[in-house]
Amino acid sequence: MDSARNFYKTILASSHPLILTIHLLGKAVPIVFYLLGSWFLSSTVQFIIVILTLAADFYFTKNINGRKLIQQRWWYDVSGEDTTTFRFESFKEYPDVAAAPINPIDSKLFWLSLYVAPTIWVVFGFLCLIKFQFVYLILVIFAGGLNLWNAYAYRLCDQWEPGHTAEAPLFQLPMLPSFANLDRVTRLQSFFTRS
């Protein structure tokens, strides 16, 4: 009981207790529904609830929570020339503006939850493979993908320096010979590289 009270006090010491609570619940609710949903709901309803909560968590983490808790935001810019790049917005861009400093509680809990949630989904993925639950594996891959993408983008945003572009590719596909129908494959490759 003391640990719950201490955690409650920690949340209250945050600069944005409501946003931090929404952020932590956004990471926890899909996991709880994944673990306990089959006891109360059909698998279809469980899938839908988990996917909707994951989508809401992705949106809120990307657009609201990161902006309020660590003063960073990212988006993926797709230009008309088949080039895609990350775009970042960070407190580092505005050193002259007297913005409120980042609360260490907000920062620690944001980054901890951002890295713990995908780790939990990866563990669930291994458990699905061991138990041969391939239908649930689809859900876990979706969940892990959304969480890992957010973690990866925020990691890049945190390391980003104003005036530089994000140039490290997510991964590089091997160079392929240019046959007639490989245009789609090269577009796929360009999706994972940033210019």
UniProtKB/Swiss-Prot annotation:
The keyword Membrane applies. The chain crosses the membrane at residues 12-34, 39-61, 109-128, 132-154. Pfam families: DUF846. It is a multi-pass membrane protein. Coiled coil: none annotated. It is found in: Golgi apparatus membrane. One of its GO terms (cellular component) is Golgi membrane. Keywords: Golgi apparatus, Membrane, Transmembrane, Transmembrane helix. InterPro entries: TVP23-like. GO terms for biological process: protein secretion; vesicle-mediated transport. Belongs to the TVP23 family. Golgi membrane protein involved in vesicular trafficking. This is Golgi apparatus membrane protein TVP23. It comes from Kluyveromyces lactis (strain ATCC 8585 / CBS 2359 / DSM 70799 / NBRC 1267 / NRRL Y-1140 / WM37). The gene is TVP23.
